[in-house]
């Protein structure tokens, strides 16, 4: 069975877009792959974090994974910082990465421009750590969005470089992009991706938003003025985005939804979608609360840590042997 790896930062509550574009799709592939789902808290500290808030968000994200349908008997759910092999392998890959290729990363350049107080080295070395997250589990498939595509290209280059310079130790991962309709955009600016870090609260729906507040956000979402419910990302980005949300939460095809609302106005469509979103959040948050407040959550994370440590140790030892680190035993 092939291995799939994905990591999410505990830097805020995931949005309904993260659920439709990632979490929901993870649930669907649990039977097809050996899945490792990682809460990447060491990536989160590349920007300043309040320690108590970070700890809370780590637990919240774990509960959100489980509420989404991740089954700990099928998948490995764990916290990055509890598996030392991540940073150990990350340092090894950092030694074969060049400053130039790290500085060319678009995310580094964007974030560096916003840091008037100096650029942390961790922002620059983020990609080799991300590469290590992936390769230490002999990952075959990595589901990523467009924003991580450049990092994945670097990961594949680092794998080639390591295998060429040392031994053919690392598995070269393949990138899997989200399915069509799986990308959810901002509610007020549907030309950009929905983001949990957006300054405008009306642009996104958090998975822990009050359901009635989320319903209002749907009703006030930007659309065009022609009143035709049709998926056309280029010419009708607003209504296309709402169709993606409707389809993602109901599992109904966009084509069927278009037929259902043929001749109907946006008011009827938005009203129905707002109820769908509200009902989804009520159900989701009930599951979330049951996991967040349960001792079972810690048992699940402990089990995941042990499994991840065992799996990553094997690859780490191969990397160390290939590079000549430590003593021969």
From Swiss-Prot:
Cellular compartments annotated:
Cytoplasm
Q: Which GO terms describe its molecular function?
A: ATP binding; tryptophan-tRNA ligase activity
Q: Where does L-tryptophan bind?
A: 133
Top EC class, one word: ligase
Domain of life per record: Bacteria
Q: Which reactions does this protein catalyse? A: tRNA(Trp) + L-tryptophan + ATP = L-tryptophyl-tRNA(Trp) + AMP + diphosphate + H(+)
Q: Where does ATP bind?
A: 9-11, 17-18, 145-147, 184, 193-197
- Which EC numbers characterise this protein's activity in its record? 6.1.1.2
| One CC-aspect GO term | cytosol
Motif location ('HIGH' region)? 10-18
PANTHER family the record matches? TRYPTOPHAN--TRNA LIGASE, MITOCHONDRIAL
The record's comment on protein family reads: Belongs to the class-I aminoacyl-tRNA synthetase family.
Q: How does it assemble?
A: Homodimer.
Name of the protein in its database record = Tryptophan--tRNA ligase
Species source reads: Staphylococcus epidermidis (strain ATCC 35984 / DSM 28319 / BCRC 17069 / CCUG 31568 / BM 3577 / RP62A)
Ranked from the top, the taxonomy reads: Bacteria, Bacillati, Bacillota, Bacilli, Bacillales
